């Protein structure tokens, strides 16, 4: 049995000075009826808490650590950069080098602007879309989280779903009125929205693989249909690849599905574990941003040299072969989970995309937020605590994606399957 006494003490202290004891809501472990685990250090595919408990890590800092914890080349790049200075507030050459690498790997990006978070990226892309098209309305999909910008916190998936909140107080009615929502994977719903509001819609923002209702890939024709609609009505298509960028494929999700948006938002992996976001796209559109154009966006720490070096070294190391290995490992996980769940009579639905996957305790095929919510949340809570006790660290929410890294091997997958079998046996009796 795991001992969590130091984590419990740390959480008690944190609650005195931080809202809810955390700096991001899902970290509080509320949806699994547990106290959060405070981590101390990580190495490769493993993470260790302050009590000395070691776990196979499938959270990976919510996706950024595609090379695993403390990758030597990334750590070395950060260290060398820090010795020169942590921030200058001026251009640096490494910004250009990372930008070139992003442009090389992401089909839609001709020019890219670096920011400090995924939320900044999506907020800035929305402003750019509105300024470029001279329109105000945005179409998004139910259950998709695009950061905590006000206009995007409408039916926003994992963040609010984990807390059981439909929206966030503080989001004005005016902003909500300019945000149109339809179910994910519902191209007919999108067509109806365009029939009604088409001349007013500045952009459609979509996760090419939804990652904040679990992991939900696009059905055939969905992304292609959005590309056709936005082109027809003169709206921009924005892919939020903050999560899927460099996770789904060497060329990101847009490369894998062969659909090219007008703008792309990035984050997570391109920071190598440090705070980074980016948005980019067609030169004609991106040159509307100041100082090249009149649409304003700025940031004190945008292009921070530590983050740029970490991101460059992370993306540089990734090869097409890594994605072949990711798919092989996740197929092994899927086959094992499917066999065990059938044998233990546990309803289970599994989705996957590149180096990320999601599973739901339901008999239904999960294709949108409504079907994701059919998962047995009480079973998930009990399952989560049992898996944690067996050294498997998963996202503490049914509506978050699960990630692997280049440091995960068949050994970690098999240990996880063994823990899953034991957990199902305990919970099913």
Swiss-Prot record:
Entries under Pfam families matching the protein: Aminotran_3
Catalytic activity: (S)-4-amino-5-oxopentanoate = 5-aminolevulinate
Annotated localization: Cytoplasm
GO biological process: protoporphyrinogen IX biosynthetic process
Signal peptide as annotated in the record: none
GO cellular component, one term: cytoplasm
Gene Ontology molecular function, alphabetical: glutamate-1-semialdehyde 2,1-aminomutase activity; pyridoxal phosphate binding; transaminase activity
Subunit structure: Homodimer.
Family: Belongs to the class-III pyridoxal-phosphate-dependent aminotransferase family. HemL subfamily.
Protein name: Glutamate-1-semialdehyde 2,1-aminomutase 1
